[in-house]
Amino acid sequence: MSTIDTTEKRERGDAALFDAAVLVAAMRAAFAKLAPRHLLRSPVMAVVMGGTVLAAVITASGHSHAGFGWAVTAILFVTVLFGNFAEAIAEARGRGQAASLRRARKDLVARRVETALGGRETRVPAAELRPGDYVMVSEGEFVPADGEIVRGVATINEAAVTGESAPVLREAGTDRSGVIGGTRVLSDEIVFKVTAEPGHSFLDRMIALVEGANRQKTPNEIALTLLLAAMTLTFLIVVASLPAIAGFVGVTLDPLLLIALLVCLIPTTIGGLLPAIGIAGMNRALSANVLAKSGKAVEVAGDVDVLLLDKTGTITYGDRQATAFHPLAGVDRVQLRDAAMLASLADPTPEGKSIVKLARQQGAIAVEAEGGDFIAFTAQTRMSGVDIGGRSIRKGAGDSIVAYVQAQGATVSPELQGRIEEVARGGATPLVVAEGRHVLGVVELSDVVKQGIKEKFAQLRAMGIKTVMITGDNPLTAAAIAAEAGVDDYIAQARPEDKLARIRAEQTGGRLVAMVGDGTNDAPALAQADVGLAMNSGTQAAKEAGNMVDLDSDPAKLLAVVEVGKQQLITRGALTTFSLANDVSKYFAILPALFAAAIPSMAALNVMQLSSPRHAVLAALIFNALIIPALIPLALRGVRFRPSSATALLRRNMMIYGVGGVLLPFAAIKAIDLALVAVLGA
């Protein structure tokens, strides 16, 4: 999916914030969340609700001025509602996204077959399918369950799940063999093996996660909740002790003023917005077409220190094309060309197809390799080829081909290493071709580093994030591309176990690691990584192992995931700073109202020159309530993220949300006081 597509999705999500249906649903849910069981999950809001009930009891019993008492009670009640509304609107947006996914889940009839080869066919409801069952799906039919293709190849429309209208190719025996229930086969026929129980499919998990049914608080969120609870308890003790202290100076305190002071002291702003921030983080990831299996995954993405990035598709465009044949001395160029083409006829990779194309462009005659035994490429052998008519042709990484030839008792000309280095220094990938015991030469495969990727890595470096390029290329090619792209380190001639070893080494050093993978051989590393981004086009094992799935199957999306995680952490930190900072102005509003009558010197604290003690209390409480809905858009969209160092981010946020959090309430409370005077009189 292009950046434009993702941007459009974000814009549609922002517009949905003000959708009438979402607002109405959130308002209803806000009242439903007044249940004690829900309120107790937020210590701050639970105390505000307790203060609301107590204020109502005091007013109803005649122990306070009725008009003032009911006004305080109403404002406190609205404060709780606004906190509930913030969480409800975040959940409502998630349910809206889930509704589109639910439409993809249909009551389907499956064609269950006996074996991977077919056999007797039985039509059964999709709900009766179990892991291990074989199902046949033909052109125009819907895939009834999650599974792995065991026979055939087909183009599949996954728009109902991923939002991407372009069909994708799925094929047995490749890293693109996974199919998702609810998608539609557009061409050909496949047999797949069911891998998920009914109700536990990929689509079911997406719906549950998006709706928030399985959302658990992240470690940082739990820590912040405990901090808010401790602060609330501390302020509760302080306020409870004030009547005794006031008695020594002959002051009788109005209980309503004490309740107002407590509510203004405790961090109600962040207390009301905290659940919404957590839910919004997962929603923002989904807006980028990334399914996070937990809020923790999004949060950890913002804390990663090391990114392991596959070269192909992430750093380069991933479209390596054969551009030249370089025969060794004594080898005819035509001999190398024809051998490379013959070894590539059954190679389904873009590189293999490009070799055939280049050979034909240079005059090679189209041939068929019927009866040949094709040798597939594996991550362990790192070569492929064909055995046909007494000939054994191999193409692959230089060291692999050298080992193959030497295993047959042959020696390799020193010229080969020079050819390999010559191609590699130019940033291309050398692919060595051998026939039998003889090395014929090198095929040059060229790729292009993505535009703007070097600047992106520079931004990551400024944030203290180390980038490591993973590639199967030889060290010289890897070094050339790493220098061009601006990565900090690279692993050349990498195997799947090398990724796992590097992740463990980084984690042993106390660093958090993120990586991308799509194959079954990537599963151990994806599971080990702190952030494992699996490609939706990959195998079921990879998607199960990772804690995130990119529905667009774009390896470069890992960079966007890091930005979403950073934005999540920055948003929570910024709003916490603002919440604590804006309490300062409330002190200057409430404290003079409590003590100025008995202690005239306390009037000096009335720096805002508020009209009366009761107006001061009402103004502070009204601001305290209104600031929650005012900040909901910021909580849901997130604070704007600008790549920079942690020190620069802290300095910027302290100026905007710290200093701003102190100054804004002074002006707002004074404006509310003037409005109260205009409406109610002095």
Curated annotation (Swiss-Prot):
Its EC number is 7.2.2.6. It catalyses: K(+)(out) + ATP + H2O = K(+)(in) + ADP + phosphate + H(+). GO terms for cellular component: plasma membrane. Keywords: ATP-binding, Cell inner membrane, Cell membrane, Ion transport, Magnesium, Membrane, Metal-binding, Nucleotide-binding, Phosphoprotein, Potassium, Potassium transport, Translocase, Transmembrane, Transmembrane helix, Transport. ATP binds at D347, E351, F377, T378, A379, Q380, T381, R382, M383, S384, K395. One of its GO terms (molecular function) is ATP binding. Mg(2+) binds at D518, D522. InterPro entries: ATPase_P-typ_cyto_dom_N, ATPase_P-typ_P_site, ATPase_P-typ_TM_dom_sf, ATPase_P-typ_transduc_dom_A_sf, HAD-like_sf, HAD_sf, P-type_ATPase_bsu_IA, P_typ_ATPase. It is an enzyme of class 7 (translocase). Part of the high-affinity ATP-driven potassium transport (or Kdp) system, which catalyzes the hydrolysis of ATP coupled with the electrogenic transport of potassium into the cytoplasm. This subunit is responsible for energy coupling to the transport system and for the release of the potassium ions to the cytoplasm. The system is composed of three essential subunits: KdpA, KdpB and KdpC. This is Potassium-transporting ATPase ATP-binding subunit. It comes from Xanthomonas axonopodis pv. citri (strain 306).
